[in-house]
Amino acid sequence: MNINVANLLNGNYILLLFVVLSLGLCLGKLRLGPVQLGNSIGVLVVSLLLGQQHFSINTEALSLGFMLFIFCVGVEAGPNFFSIFFRDGKNYFMLALVMVGSAMLLALGLGKFFGWGIGLTAGMLAGSMTSTPVLVGAGDTLRNTASMGSQLGIEQDHLSLGYALTYLVGLVSLIFGARYLPKLQHQDLPTSAQQIARERGLDADSQRKVYLPVIRAYRVGPELVDWAAGKNLRELGIYRQTGCYIERIRRNGILASPDGDAVLQIGDEIALVGYPDSHSRLNSNFRDGKEVFDRDLLDMRIVTEEIVVKNHNAVGKRLSQLKLTDHGCFLNRIVRSQIEMPIDDSVVLNKGDVLQVSGDARRVKSIADRIGFISIHSQVTDLLAFCAFFVIGIMVGLITIQFSNFTFGIGNAAGLLFAGIMLGFLRANHPTFGYIPQGALNMVKEFGLMVFMAGVGLSAGSTINSSLGEVGIQMLASGLIVSLVPVVICFLFGAYVLKMNRALLFGAMMGARTCAPAMDIISDTARSNIPALGYAGTYAIANVLLTLAGSLIVIIWPELPG
């Protein structure tokens, strides 16, 4: 039995697609020194190579892939987008705008200088910024530009070619910039991180172990009563001194939950709740009374829940104002835009932030009702909301706007991005609406992106040889410029205009580039996870701005002088 692989792949689009994805994902696992190629570039390289052999794929698959990807980007950005845009994220918004705006202007200037078309120029911008949202936004706007005519296919091929040529340049140059740029300025990052840690009263260490609180029971002896000196629990402030709080007291056989006015007496049995290291550091006055085993006293269900910040009495407040420990709860982590934040009493809470809180089930439920709601523990996606907002996004994308003789459409990219942001925002406000497990969202977003990359690579592969010799060196040099110059501009703007702390500034710069590998290097250099505060501040807004930049560069290109 003879099998003609070429005919088999050409006759079966689905098989070809998954062969490209499988080979590309394998290639993406390879590392060049400290740099991993990544899934996007792996799939793109394989699809370009197969495209050279005249394999092709249905363009509808390409369209569906980019639609799924950009919609999921909007859903992820939605919970924090408006709070960053309108509230305390002004500096972060301005940094992201400077980064994206300067890169777009440089790309436009270089494209005109070298005489490229819009496809190469937009592709170079996307690759240099290592930003698939730019690629997606530009590709969608190209398809909806009637004036392209017969040039449309060529420009689409050049779009993916420009991206493929400059992606690794953008990634490697940013990683080296993240490693060496902090050393060229006067303030070192560890010192800046420690300064923020001292000002805000948090641990600057980037590694933090999280434990569940445990409960132990002790009998109150004369030493503890003498130490209390007749003060009630409110006056004693036991949590501030020990890291534990008194959950229950048994006195004369009666079990009760104490209020702040209770005074400890000899013979009381108290249940203390705290982290294991807090118990190990307890003052000897507690241990002089014997530890006791009392089934009823120790009968407390410790739970850990993820609470989504929603209510007005929590949004805009500092973490310290929640007084979680006063309510018998322990904060394990804070997540914003899928980025884990340092636990910082000065962090201002945004709508959609997720707090992981441990404590007695009743107390955690009470805290959740006060600040928002407990995130649904479900693996079931609200497909109705997902599909309905997807349809809304496509409908919004059909809207056209006319200025004098100039007409342009909003396009599917902007429409779906808007619809995704709205779905994410509504999800952050209504616990039972539009739920999408993070794993499912990641899978759909990644799959959509890989399908899109496979489509553009197969489409452009047939023209890569003829185009590469003409623009290769120019493209690589331009990619290096567009990758690094905006980073320098952004640093100068943040350091000397906004006067930001350097650790926060470098984190915010990497967030504006949406580059996680570079962010890891910044955290290592700072020996702290404090730069994550800045990274989370710019990440969500940068994803949106990058998508819009991809569309905008195509729209304004014809209006620029040749």
UniProtKB/Swiss-Prot annotation:
GO BP annotation list: potassium ion transport
One GO MF term: monoatomic cation transmembrane transporter activity
Mode of membrane association: Multi-pass membrane protein
Membrane spanning stretches: 8-28, 32-52, 66-86, 93-113, 116-136, 158-178, 383-403, 406-426, 447-467, 478-498, 537-557
Domain of life of the native organism: Bacteria
One Pfam family matching this protein: TrkA_C
PROSITE patterns: RCK_C (PS51202)
Keywords: Cell membrane, Membrane, Repeat, Transmembrane, Transmembrane helix, Transport
Keyword Metal-binding: no
InterPro entries: AAE_transporter, RCK_C, RCK_C_sf, Transp_YbjL_put, YidE_YbjL
GO CC entries: plasma membrane
Domain RCK C-terminal: 202-288, 292-373
Keyword Metal-binding: no
Principal localisation: membrane
Subcellular location: Cell membrane
PANTHER family, per database record: K(+)_H(+) ANTIPORTER SUBUNIT KHTT (PTHR30445), TRANSPORT PROTEIN YBJL-RELATED (PTHR30445:SF10)
Protein family: Belongs to the AAE transporter (TC 2.A.81) family. YbjL subfamily.
Record-given protein name: Putative transport protein PC1_1686
